[in-house]
Amino acid sequence: MRLDLTQPDFKAAIPILKKIEAAGYEAYFVGGSVRDAILGLPIHDVDIASSAYPAEIKRIFKRTADTGIEHGTVMVLDHGTGYEVTTFRTESRYQDFRRPDHVTFVRSLAEDLKRRDFTINALAVRHDGTIIDLFDGLKDLQHHQLRAVGNPHERFHEDALRMMRAVRFESQLGFGIEPATKAAIADNAKLLVHISVERVAAEFNRLLTGIDRRAGLQDFIETRLFAYAPKMAAHETALTQFSQLPDTQLTSLASGWAALIFLLRTQPLVMLKAWKQSNELITLVTQTVKLLQVMPNPTAWDLYQAGEAAVTTASEVQKLLTPDFDQQQLAEAYAALPIHSKKELALTGADLIKAGVRPGPAMGKALNQIEQRVVAGALPNELKKLLPIATEMSQDRL
């Protein structure tokens, strides 16, 4: 079988493979780009593996950068876009269950491929498109199956993050996990505690937005990986409930986290801080969960306080929780608000001061009451109508 290499990212990198081969070494496309190209998915980073050692790559090409030379990776810059070329290697013991204690450069493609995580990621492609498949990766791609290369227990002891990658790929690609590989995840789930929260979160985030979220979550639960993830151990019931929701692919990470946290009935700040998520995500999920608590019939003030992003996110989550929920009606209700932020309010504190109102708590309270009444439609958003009412409310004149 040959892979069509006319995609721009591959096509642009073919001269690099040819130049390495012309110097007497082997060079192949490897990794996720090969897998995704075979599946007909968009490809992203193109990785190249070679029998040439780093010093030899640097002699072959005029412009290079040492991006990870201790692990055999050199960035080749000769052809515009940089391409990482990594020397074939074997790895020794993994005492921290994440990084090898020692890396040895080798000349054998087979030795390099057998250390990889799953068979679908252990394919190599020559510059003419010829596919090298030493571990039946093509067969597993055909059957939509995730299977560890060689002994799965060894693969997960080498790098415990691979277990999270398995459930992430299950969701992202819509693949199933081969029974022996799944059993090995269950046997080794406790090793996940050795992996940094950031790395675990990166995989879980991608699981939440995959095309088969249910399958990924179900195996996350069945293999007990969840028990070793931040703040998840006590929430098997809610996680199971989450995994049973319709498998509609979510459009945003915030929707996934908001749905999960709403079902967990836990504080968004506590959970998301434990998972080391961004402040931006924490704010949006917090606003969304607050709105979900008054759904499906929020007031105009609820919608106004939530803001457009949280309304959109809550709408998607509510549709997941209640399939007959009318998202269009919610969108129209938000769009129909007289104002959508305080900046749009016709009355300001400066207007009140100019009218003789003393700055202070009374003025702030009056402005807040005016804002709420305008949002509710009880008052028109017109300065000439709002100013006398707010002035009277303040009752604290100069």
From Swiss-Prot:
Its EC number is 2.7.7.72. ATP binds at G32, R35, R116, D159, R162, R165, R168. It catalyses: a tRNA precursor + 2 CTP + ATP = a tRNA with a 3' CCA end + 3 diphosphate; a tRNA with a 3' CCA end + 2 CTP + ATP = a tRNA with a 3' CCACCA end + 3 diphosphate. InterPro entries: Bact_CCA-adding_enz_type3_sf, CCA-adding_enz_C, CCA-adding_enz_firmicutes, NT_sf, PolA_pol_head_dom, PolyA_RNA-bd. Keywords: ATP-binding, Magnesium, Metal-binding, Nucleotide-binding, Nucleotidyltransferase, RNA repair, RNA-binding, Transferase, tRNA processing. It holds the Pfam family tRNA_NucTran2_2. Its cofactor is Mg(2+). A single active site specifically recognizes both ATP and CTP and is responsible for their addition. Homodimer. Catalyzes the addition and repair of the essential 3'-terminal CCA sequence in tRNAs without using a nucleic acid template. Adds these three nucleotides in the order of C, C, and A to the tRNA nucleotide-73, using CTP and ATP as substrates and producing inorganic pyrophosphate. tRNA 3'-terminal CCA addition is required both for tRNA processing and repair. Also involved in tRNA surveillance by mediating tandem CCA addition to generate a CCACCA at the 3' terminus of unstable tRNAs. While stable tRNAs receive only 3'-terminal CCA, unstable tRNAs are marked with CCACCA and rapidly degraded. This is CCA-adding enzyme.
